[in-house]
Amino acid sequence: MTIFSLPTGAVVDRLPTGAVVALGYFDGVHLGHRAIIDTARREAEARDAVPAVWMISSEGGGYKRDSLEITCEEEKHALLYEAGARYAVVHDFSEVRGLAGEEFVRLVLKEALRVSCVVCGKNFRFGKGASVDSDGLRTLCDNVGIDTVVVPHVTDVCGDTVSSTKIRRLITDGDVEAADLMLGRPYSFTSTVLEGKRLGRTIGFPTINQVPKQGRLLPKNGVYAVCVEFFDGGVRRSYAGAANVGVCPTVASDVSEDVLAREGVACAERRVCETYIAGFDGELYGREVTVRFLRRLRGEKAFSGIDELKEQISRDAVAAAQIYNEIYGKQ
């Protein structure tokens, strides 16, 4: 078990006694998760305690996911802090998978963490084989003097119940606009810009090429209006962009196989995000860049030649800039 202080990520020896701890996996840190953490924050304020989260590590031993992740742990920690948590207790699944519900409450929550209150969502399950639900958690915590708050389901502005499973499906289907409503922010990933042969520049549309970190979701193949962010001279810059996601996007094939291999991407599965950044003509190779998906523009398309390709990229760039301006204001 590792305890991090947020937002720095520094490891600390102990969680302050009497903390209010939100329980969950928190993939995506969506609106439902934020409601849980906000409840923990308010409970902590009332008790003069610290708000914290407990979660299973996606990068630790023994935990096997059957789906790609919405957020990596680094992103998750930053979002948890933004939502109100001040400590993150991260457990390797191998350390807790054999614990019965009663053992988890007694050994982890009561003895190791010394919490005063736990907060969870209605669907939270724990214990060996996920055998205990939120009602069972309340009963077990009552037995050892820990208070329990169960937060009801949260819906988005369209009235749909928010869940990580639904968000993954929406992203996979390319409906990033609906996913963004449940997340409460645009879906995004951050990764290093890969070096290529600069083929985009030869047709007047320089692009950056990125491969998300292993295990991360990418939307359905196609073209998206995006917001592109990176630091320049210590200042965060934001630009409108048109991103093409696919196995072999328009000019992303200029990313050599040895570069992809260094990123751990097999040739047969090299889904690349290739992004044209409107109004930017600088150098970003080797730098960390964040791409935020705003809206799907179109599916994949074959082109008869360079002229047709250039015309389509130009139309995509105009459409993407209009969407960006609607959300963020004119550049």
State the predicted function of each range.
Residues 22-24, 54-55, 88-92, 117-122, ...:
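Short beta-strands and strand-loop turn motifs
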Residues 75-89:
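A glycine-rich helix N-cap at a beta->alpha junction
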Residues 67-76, 97-105:
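Glycine-rich, highly charged phosphate/nucleotide-binding loops
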Residues 10-72:
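N-terminal catalytic cores of NTP/NDP-binding nucleotidyl/phosphoryl-transfer enzymes
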